[in-house]
Amino acid sequence: MQRDAIAAARNAGCSSGRISQPPPPPFYSAATGIYSSIHPPVALPTDPSLTLVAHLFARLPLADPGAPTLVDAATASAVSRADLRRLVASLAAGLRRRHGVRKGSVVLLLLPNSVAFPVSFLAVLAAGAVATTMNPSSSPAEIAAQARATGACLVLASRDGAARLPPLAAPVVLVPEILDHSAAADDGDDDQRVFAAFRAMLDGGGGDGTETAVPVVGQDDAVAILYSSGTSGRSKGVVLTHRNLIAMTELFVRFEASQYHARGARENVYMAALPMSHVYGLSLFAVGLLSIGATVVVMRRFDAGDAVAAIGRYKVTHMPLVPPIMAAMVRAAAAGGVPPSQVASLVQVSCGAAPITAALIHEFLQAFPHVDFIQGYGMTESTAVGTRGFNTSKHKKYTSVGLLAPNMHAKIVHLESSSCLPPGFSGELWLHGPGIMKGYLSDDDDACTRKDGWLRTGDIAYFDLDGYLYIVGRLKDTIKYKGFQIAPGDLEEVLIHHPEILDVAVTSAEDEEAGEIPVAFVVRRSGSNLSCKQVMEYVAKQVAPYKRVRKVVFVEAIPKSPAGKVLRRLLRNSHDTAAAATSSCSISSKL
């Protein structure tokens, strides 16, 4: 492997007891063990009273106010730059007047991708409140748990999602997928009734016309609570500040976009096929890209054929995606469903959120040879800021997740000695920079996750001599299913309540279609005839579809440390599960 060659080179010339080592590269300090970005620093706003929405709209170009900023891929219904400013301001006023939303209030967004998502998200922030997002396919139990943990005072949900809502203390307002600023957009009297509350808020909330007081909010106030599996254990609420998201906008989105402007790229048109409820999609399509005046073409749900058609129709130039979407595009091309003329406008495809195989990268480059392909790395805890791929005439390192973003620093820490490691050596990746979260909603394990401002990612990685980062494994237990994060503890909490299950541990297995799938190792109670199918059906009724257990292995005992901690690595690394299992079964990751 490349890192082995680097390490071997360091030991060259060791004869006669003399060790000759090359000087460290300029981006690495041997004295401190810290890696720095090779990009020039980016100046970030210092005004402590600045908010994210104010920053975005100050950055949004004033020229051409009628230019589309959000476009519904299916209908071509658009929100212009001027519309965006007006709709966010009026909806924020409606939230304050109609529902008493104020500084510190938490509003839960249970919404699918739509042009209404960014407007709703930014309006919550403009009202002085905190937004917390959820995948709209979440189960009633998951919705109730997050609403309770965050103290949500209001829920914004889609019409389809309303059917899954459990009884909640907070009121629910249904949000349409299309915004053309009038009730006439709704289909018939029933739609007008269903969305009447939202339309009333969108008109500013009515009242006597007196503006409610706008809360005083600053950079260090919370702006979002996004859920992540963290570095281990159960899902945790990640508290992000206005400062975090402003840094993300500048260091991730605007900086990367500037690289393509510098190359003389045409007007940027981005396809939003990633869920905006996740930090990857949220940071791009509901926040950062809106500040540069790009057009965001929103797919309500991904379909490879529809995506190809939308690329051709809207002349899409950039397509951020995750490995399963990338694989679907490759399959569509192999089946002859991607005419070259339809994707000729595509300049860049970026991939993140989950590991990707070298084979899939090769297949993609064969199918789309004109596209600049890069990978990136970030976490919810780093507000998606970490590294971004950067191809040059000299370097095209497609399997790397790229270079450190501006203003970011990293360490590679030895797993046993905790010493810092130079390029070519693998260890745990630690990150430091302005995107690092304020903390978890519950600070129970914050100290072990952050140390002196450093975020311990739980990922095993190394830097090469050019400053490119490679992820080679991980310490943490998170399962990445089609780009979605699944905390094993969440599934174990569901399974252990089954009356016929004595003990359980959930880990991951590699899967060609999904990247990874959840695998449940189950110890049945004495006399139980519980089947694999029954276990999977039990879980499926209580979690979002992407969280379903895809394989069940019945075992006699769960391996644990003397302290009682489940040794997931033994389960994950065991290639001969049949030797330990009494029986097993699985379902397709395509379901």
Swiss-Prot record:
Organism: Oryza sativa subsp. japonica (Rice)
UniProt record, GO biological process: phenylpropanoid metabolic process; ubiquinone biosynthetic process
Alphabetical UniProt keywords: ATP-binding, Ligase, Magnesium, Nucleotide-binding
Region described as SBD2: spans on this chain: 376-440
Presence of the UniProt keyword Secreted in the record: no
Pfam families in UniProt: AMP-binding, AMP-binding_C
Binding annotation for CoA: R301, K482, G483
Amino acids binding ATP: S228, S229, G230, T231, S232, K236, Q375, G376, T380, D459, R474, K565
CDD domains per the UniProt record, alphabetical: 4CL (cd05904)
Cofactor: Mg(2+)
PANTHER family reported for this sequence: AMP-BINDING DOMAIN-CONTAINING PROTEIN-RELATED (PTHR24096:SF149), LONG-CHAIN-FATTY-ACID--COA LIGASE (PTHR24096)
Binding site for (E)-4-coumaroyl-AMP: Y280, A353, Q375, G376, T380, K476, K480
Official protein name in the record: 4-coumarate--CoA ligase-like 3
EC number per UniProt: 6.2.1.12
GO MF entry, a single one: 4-coumarate-CoA ligase activity
Membership in a protein family: Belongs to the ATP-dependent AMP-binding enzyme family.
